[in-house]
Amino acid sequence: MLRGKIFQKGDTLIEVLFAVTVFSLVVVGALSIMNSSTAVAERALETTLVRNQIDAQAEALRYIHDSYIATYPNPVVGQPSAEWSTKIVTNEATGATKFGTCTPPTNAFVVNTGNDKVESRSVITTDVQSYAQLRLNPTVSSEGLWVEAIKSNSSNKYIDFHIRACWYSQGLNTPMTLGTIVRLYEP
């Protein structure tokens, strides 16, 4: 009777361990793919949100410019039209920083989209918590988002506004950067 049980066919310990190992590899592979897909989806969402922040800066610059043009040559103090002549023109540079640089220059600024006021470089930080954005909490702060005003050298009077964003995304060693250029002509 004992002899019959010894020679019965069944799963050996090695076969069971091999099956568990294969199952574990499949599970780890599936989780890795899911994690990678989640990171890609998060980067896509961050890029969309940052693009919205950049578009908001561009629209605020256009609004301030249009206010300035509407009241030219006498901008109204305390109104968006005065921001153009008192803060934007005084922050002009002769050349933009290299794209991909995550350190804003000293003449960088950001437009507070809550009240259309130009905020100085002091509110811009490169310590980004999630994605490049303008925070309108009790105090204004800009995380990885800034504007550079570049005056033209030609007889055409215009200013190119380089709107830049830089932040570190999940799973990447290099920073994500986005930017656009808005050209506005002066009267």
Located regions from the model:
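N-terminal leader/signal peptides at the extreme start of proteins
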Residues: 1-11
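Aliphatic-rich helix starts adjacent to a transmembrane/signal segment
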Residues: 11-56
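Low-complexity, Gly/Pro-rich coil/beta segments used as flexible assembly/activation regions
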Residues: 58-187
